[in-house]
Amino acid sequence: MEPVIPEGALSQSTKDFLAGVSGGVAQVLVGQPFDCVKVRLQSQSNVSPIYNNALDCVKKISKNEGLAAFYKGTVLPLLGIGFCVSIQFTTFEYCKRFFSRDGTPVTMPQYYVSGAISGLANSFLVGPVEHVRIRLQIQTGKNVLYHGPWDCIKKISSQYGLSGIMKGYNPTAAREAHGLGMYFLAYEALVKNTMAKHHLTDRSQTPGWKLCVFGAGAGYAMWLAAYPFDIVKSKIQTDGFLSKATYKNSWQCAKGIYTKAGLRGFYRGFVPVLVRAAPANAVTFYVYETVSQHIRHL
């Protein structure tokens, strides 16, 4: 069992929150270009696609829109996803402390449950943040509907209210719960295995490069489990509103994807996600663990 660190002026939850924000900001800066490619591939038509594959997508975006296009809509996720990741880690660490309150080690199923709870808590914020980001990412050319994240929020909320902003929430919640359950389970299993194998008494003794590898592995575990939900979410969040919507609900969307493209349709755009998963999640956990160690005695 890892030693209990006495709290200083800051509560443990506050420390988890600050470390999570740091990890989230790092994740956005590294992962945003990959996410842009993923969304373009996911949201394009199955009948007449604009991009043949991920590399073709990168080439066409670079040529037609410039390199800055890969960071479209970054301001909101930089703030929003940073906050989202802090919610993930704060909730997860709180659940870990709850499950180990009587001194017993946290079990693997409890790690999954803790991750799933953190995903549900996070989904209320990440849903609208990603909705706005996606609306901005799919805009091409000069005649755009939304001029930045705040303009996007204003226009959607004024026309369609809160339900418009929260469009695609159900598949987002499913993705976050199952995905983060697997995410934290994989990471903690790798850390625990290393600590036991090398007789480490504290996770701060784990080398930084291993934290990066474990973070990358956790990212793969999450996306392998959650990607089909993400496909449905992206389809709905790039769909029209109310009477202009192609899909009435998530189930109809999933059936439509399967009818047109089979199981392969649920993994469209998966290559840039796999490429992104390693660096984005490696840096997330490395920054989170590093900041946690630096502020643990505050």
UniProtKB/Swiss-Prot annotation:
Membrane topology per record: Multi-pass membrane protein
Solcar repeat segments: 14-98, 106-193, 206-294
Keyword Hydrolase: no
PROSITE patterns: SOLCAR
InterPro entries named among the record's database cross-references: Mit_carrier, Mitochondrial_Carrier, Mitochondrial_sb/sol_carrier, Mt_carrier_dom_sf
Keyword presence, Iron: no
Alphabetical list of Gene3D superfamilies matching this protein: Mitochondrial carrier domain (1.50.40.10)
A Gene Ontology BP annotation from the UniProt entry: mitochondrial L-ornithine transmembrane transport
GO cellular component: mitochondrial inner membrane; mitochondrion
Keywords, comma-separated and alphabetical: Membrane, Mitochondrion, Mitochondrion inner membrane, Repeat, Transmembrane, Transmembrane helix, Transport
TM region(s), chain numbering: 17-37, 67-87, 112-132, 172-192, 212-232, 266-287
Family: Belongs to the mitochondrial carrier (TC 2.A.29) family.
Function: Acts as a glutamate and glycine mitochondrial transmembrane transporter.
UniProt name for this protein: Glutamate/glycine mitochondrial carrier ymc1
Annotated organism of origin: Schizosaccharomyces pombe (strain 972 / ATCC 24843)
